[in-house]
Regions:
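Membrane-interface helix-loop junctions and terminal tails of multi-pass membrane proteins
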Residues: 1-296
Length: 296
């Protein structure tokens, strides 16, 4: 995103992006369950749709808000700012998280309405058990590590594809189905479907996701040191190829063509910073901020 993108516009991008993600996750889950009684087949369809949708949404909304789509991703961005790096301020993080949660609920309700179901009916699928919480810690930690790791080694452009691929895999290799997204988890409690989660299961899942985010940050710091990806709302500047630290661009008051180049480069680089989102299928689909710069 550019340095001139207003917070309201970024919040709108997060709300719409997260809503779109939940429409994909919940809608594909409903469709899959209706078309096949085989849970494995339904999970394949749901995980594929969720991963493809997540990658496209990150690519589309990344230049606007960083496409966090996930409060955990947003919190990692805020933490980077608190520890002397670049990221979102406290007010921005709160606005992002609120927009993501509202979007997730709206997306789940919309998906229910599309299939002629009762919009807003709470899910009845209880997901409890310590093994599921461990699965959420692992899923969320991996998501944050993917985003942080790519951002810190100068490969942020790969985040949309990498996050989508990771979520598709995590849906299968984690016991919880990789919700990995507090906003998405809350939204899915409003859908009594294949991807739903009963309200009483929310506290444990959200707590596990927050813990997983902290673990992911710790692993990124351990593996890559203190190098941080640049913030999505940073001034126009060209990022260093490896560290991801913005380097000032010498002003050029010559032809407009040169000015365009100086402006376009940062926009493309910064779009690759924050994202997210975690989503899952039968058990979850973290969407996350996948994302361009990190946070998230």
């Amino acid at each position: 995103m550019t340095a001139h993108t207003s917070l309201p516009r970024r919040a709108a991008a997060e709300l719409i992006g997260t809503a779109g993600l939940l429409v994909v996750v919940v809608g594909s889950g409903i469709q899959a369950a209706e078309l096949s009684r085989d849970t494995g087949v339904a999970l394949i369809a749901n995980s594929l749709a969720s991963a493809v949708g997540l990658g496209l949404i990150i690519t589309l909304f990344g230049p606007l808000s960083g496409a966090h789509l996930n409060p955990v991703v947003t919190l990692t961005s805020w933490w980077a700012r608190c520890t002397g790096g670049e990221g979102l301020g406290g007010r921005e993080a709160l606005v992002y998280a609120a927009a993501q949660t509202a979007g997730a609920i709206g997306g789940a309700v919309l998906a229910e309405a599309m299939f002629g179901r009762t919009p807003g009916a709470f899910a009845t699928q209880v997901r409890d058990g310590g093994h599921l919480l461990v699965g959420e810690v692992v899923a969320t930690a991996g998501l944050v590590l993917v985003i942080q790791g790519l951002g810190r080694i100068g490969r942020a452009k790969l985040i949309p594809v990498a996050v989508a691929a990771y979520i598709a895999a995590a849906i299968w290799f984690t016991s919880s189905g990789s919700f990995a997204n507090p906003a998405g988890t809350i939204g899915r409690s409003f859908s009594d479907s294949f991807t739903g989660i009963a309200p009483q299961s929310l506290p444990g899942f959200v707590a596990a996701q927050l813990l997983g985010g902290a673990v992911g940050l710790a692993l990124a710091a351990l593996l890559y040191g203190g190098v941080r990806a640049g913030r999505t709302d940073a001034p126009a500047a060209e990022e260093a190829p490896v560290a991801g630290v913005p380097v000032a661009v010498t002003p050029v008051a010559v032809a407009p063509v040169v000015v365009d180049v100086v402006v376009d480069v940062p926009v493309e680089r910064e779009a690759v910073a924050e994202s997210l989102s975690g989503t899952g299928p039968a058990e979850g689909t973290a969407t996350s901020k996948a994302a361009y710069e990190t946070i998230g």
